[in-house]
Amino acid sequence: MARSVGWRRSALITVSGCVILNWWGNLMVFVDLLFPVQGGPVPLDHAYLLFSALSRHLPALHERSDMGVFSLRGVSNTRELLYLGRGTMRLRCPIEAVATLLPLVSAPLEIAGRRLSLGAPSLHALEPVPSLFARLVTFKHAMDEAAFVAAASRALEALGVQATLKVGRRRIVRITGKKVVGFALELHGLSAEHSLRVQEQGMGGRRHMGCGLFLPPGRAARVQSHGKAA
């Protein structure tokens, strides 16, 4: 029997190999799965810990370079802890990979000694909006803004995407004990095709750890307002 995933402005998807159309009537290639999360709190800088916890349940995730793992959404009153409350975890994946992620529902996850559990996910179609925002994008050796802009421009050219760049806040995260430097990034003036391409392919490295993943600015702002990042 096919298992169903909830929907928002998109056709109901059944994990049974059927053709899925988004709310523009086009074939959906990538989607976002939003899992409700209970438990915590977790460290504010938790991207590597989250990916490690997910990989313990889904070892094949290491090999899926086409999947993105966003940082958890929650509320932070300090610069150290994220309180999840009615938080969510967002995974971006090809439509054909949805079924492989459903075993995460109710799977016990442990992050920094705190137990988390995931509820049944809802499915969200990617939106071809003209502006996109990423909280953190990283490129090798792009330690300052000038080097970052050059690397981001090369990445867009490689994707065949035309856009205006606006670089935001410089951020530092820790991955396997090492400091990684990146910047927030806005893209403007995107065509519908290019907008979807950026969301599907991402930019830069470490997309399993919340980097290089884009959302429409309004949605990204709502996420950030619930989880103030260091």
UniProtKB/Swiss-Prot annotation:
Gene Ontology biological process: defense response to virus
Q: Under which EC number(s) is this enzyme classified? A: 3.1.-.-
Task: Write one Pfam family the protein is assigned to.
Answer: Cas6
A Gene Ontology molecular function term for this protein is: RNA binding
Top-level lineage group: Bacteria
Identify the keywords attached in UniProt to this record, alphabetized.
Antiviral defense, Endonuclease, Hydrolase, Nuclease, RNA-binding
Q: What induces it?
A: Part of an operon going from at least MXAN_7266 to MXAN_7259 that includes a CRISPR operon with transcription continuing into the pre-crRNA locus.
Key word Hydrolase present in the record? yes
Q: Which CDD domains match?
A: Cas6-I-III (cd09703)
Please name the NCBIfam families in this protein's record. Answer: cas6_cmx6
Give the similarity note. Belongs to the CRISPR-associated protein Cas6/Cse3/CasE family. Subtype Myxan subfamily.
Q: What does this protein do?
A: CRISPR (clustered regularly interspaced short palindromic repeat) is an adaptive immune system that provides protection against mobile genetic elements (viruses, transposable elements and conjugative plasmids). CRISPR clusters contain sequences complementary to antecedent mobile elements and target invading nucleic acids. CRISPR clusters are transcribed and processed into CRISPR RNA (crRNA). Processes pre-crRNA into individual crRNA units.
| The protein's name in its UniProt record | CRISPR-associated endonuclease Cas6
